[in-house]
């Protein structure tokens, strides 16, 4: 069974997008940040009325601390239970971890990591191709209740495997014109990921195309951006062939999902370890 901490908050997080404030986003870098989340506990629990009996160890330790170790810091029985839970969670996540090291991409791609952002780079016949993606918010939400488990059937067999399908940006720079980059913003349509019925079907799509200055760290919204929703299909097919000729095809997209999923799981385990260290720190 997938650990409770990993699946439940992500499901709850997907249920409150309407509460998030709308903010302008770059048309290419779909590297989203998490929105605000609702507090699951009433604020009344965080205060104590005058004259009421104080719950030991809820907010303040009695004396130097609740456990009597004399450190003078707040750490309650709830913190201890939290740390024990995180220990079990980390063990379970390591048990189901498929890749102890990140899988390599075929085709001579070089990987460069910067936290949750990853860059894949290669050079082909005088051209530099860079693919950038971010694992944050890259796991599609899962919803319960689609199918009830039959009698005697284990629940964990019906829980879907978490797969990271990040948006990614392809940047192509030609050496004879190194100041200009062709930028293609791509994503994985939800109805295409994991489908193997149609061998010729593309598992990723191009959403937007533009030219940007290769020396700029941030791309400009003032540059003309071509949205593929209203694009002639012949032109769209040529753009997809353009990417395939440079190694960005279905095979690449499959391997990118595998790499991103392994990286996301690795970062998730690191987050749990940091959270455990923070809660138990004195």
Curated annotation (Swiss-Prot):
Record has Membrane as a keyword: yes
Organelle targeting peptide span: 1-70
Subcellular location, record wording: Mitochondrion matrix; Nucleus; Cell membrane; Secreted
Organism domain of life: Eukaryota
Keyword Nucleotide-binding found: no
C1q binding, as annotated region: 76-93
Phosphoserine: modified positions: 201, 205
Disordered: annotated segments: 137-163
Pfam families reported for this sequence: MAM33 (PF02330)
N6-acetyllysine found at: 91
GO biological process: apoptotic process; complement activation, classical pathway; cytosolic ribosome assembly; DNA damage response; innate immune response; mRNA processing; negative regulation of defense response to virus; negative regulation of double-strand break repair via homologous recombination
GO CC annotations, alphabetized: cell surface; cytoplasm; extracellular region; mitochondrial matrix; nucleolus; nucleus; plasma membrane
Record PTM Phosphotyrosine, positions in chain: 188
Membrane topology reported for the UniProt record: Peripheral membrane protein
Region described as Interaction with MAVS: 168-213
One Gene Ontology MF term: hyaluronic acid binding
Disulfide bonding pattern of the chain: none
Keywords (A to Z) from UniProt: Acetylation, Adaptive immunity, Apoptosis, Cell membrane, Complement pathway, Cytoplasm, DNA damage, Host-virus interaction, Immunity, Innate immunity, Membrane, Mitochondrion, mRNA processing, mRNA splicing, Nucleus, Phosphoprotein, Ribosome biogenesis, Secreted, Transcription, Transcription regulation, Transit peptide
Family statement: Belongs to the MAM33 family.
Subunit structure: Homotrimer; three monomers form a donut-shaped structure with an unusually asymmetric charge distribution on the surface. Interacts with CDK13, HRK, VTN, NFYB, ADRA1B, FOXC1, DDX21, DDX50, NCL, SRSF1 and SRSF9. Interacts with CD93; the association may represent a cell surface C1q receptor. Interacts with KRT1; the association represents a cell surface kininogen receptor. Interacts with CD209; the interaction is indicative for a C1q:C1QBP:CD209 signaling complex. Interacts with FBL and RRP1; the respective interactions with C1QBP are competitive. Probably associates with the mitoribosome. (Microbial infection) Interacts with Rubella virus capsid protein; the interaction occurs in mitochondria.
Functional note: Multifunctional and multicompartmental protein involved in inflammation and infection processes, ribosome biogenesis, protein synthesis in mitochondria, regulation of apoptosis, transcriptional regulation and pre-mRNA splicing. At the cell surface is thought to act as an endothelial receptor for plasma proteins of the complement and kallikrein-kinin cascades. Putative receptor for C1q; specifically binds to the globular 'heads' of C1q thus inhibiting C1; may perform the receptor function through a complex with C1qR/CD93. (Microbial infection) During bacterial infection processes acts as an attachment site for microbial proteins, including Listeria monocytogenes internalin B (InlB).
PANTHER family assigned: COMPLEMENT COMPONENT 1, COMPLEMENT COMPONENT 1 Q SUBCOMPONENT-BINDING PROTEIN, MITOCHONDRIAL
Protein name: Complement component 1 Q subcomponent-binding protein, mitochondrial
Native source organism of the sequence: Chlorocebus aethiops (Green monkey)
């Amino acid at each position: 069974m997938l650990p409770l901490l990993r699946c439940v908050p992500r499901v709850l997080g997907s249920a409150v997008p309407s509460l998030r404030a709308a903010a302008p986003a770059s048309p290419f870098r779909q590297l989203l940040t998490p929105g605000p989340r609702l507090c699951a506990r009433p604020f009344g629990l965080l205060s104590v009325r005058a004259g009421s009996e104080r719950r030991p160890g809820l907010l303040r330790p009695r004396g130097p601390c609740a456990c009597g170790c004399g450190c003078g810091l707040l750490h309650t029985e709830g913190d201890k239970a939290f740390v024990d839970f995180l220990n079990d969670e980390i063990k379970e996540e390591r048990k189901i971890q498929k890749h102890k090291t990140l899988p390599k991409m075929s085709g001579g791609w070089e990987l460069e990591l910067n936290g949750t952002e990853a860059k894949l780079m290669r050079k082909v016949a005088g051209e530099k191709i860079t693919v950038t993606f971010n694992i944050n918010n890259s796991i599609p939400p899962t919803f319960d209740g689609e199918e009830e488990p039959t009698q005697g059937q284990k629940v964990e067999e019906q829980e879907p495997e978490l797969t990271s399908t990040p948006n990614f940006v392809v940047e192509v720079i030609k050496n004879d014109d190194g100041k200009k980059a062709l930028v293609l913003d791509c994503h994985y349509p939800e109805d295409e990921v994991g489908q193997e019925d149609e061998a010729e079907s593309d598992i990723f799509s191009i959403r937007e195309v533009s030219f940007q200055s290769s020396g700029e760290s941030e791309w400009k919204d003032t540059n003309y951006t071509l949205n593929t929703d209203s694009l002639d299909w012949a032109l769209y097919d040529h753009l997809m062939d353009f990417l395939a000729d440079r190694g960005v095809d279905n095979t690449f997209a499959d391997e990118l999902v595998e790499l991103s999923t392994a990286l996301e799981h690795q970062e998730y385990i690191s987050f749990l370890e940091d959270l455990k260290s923070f809660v138990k720190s004195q």
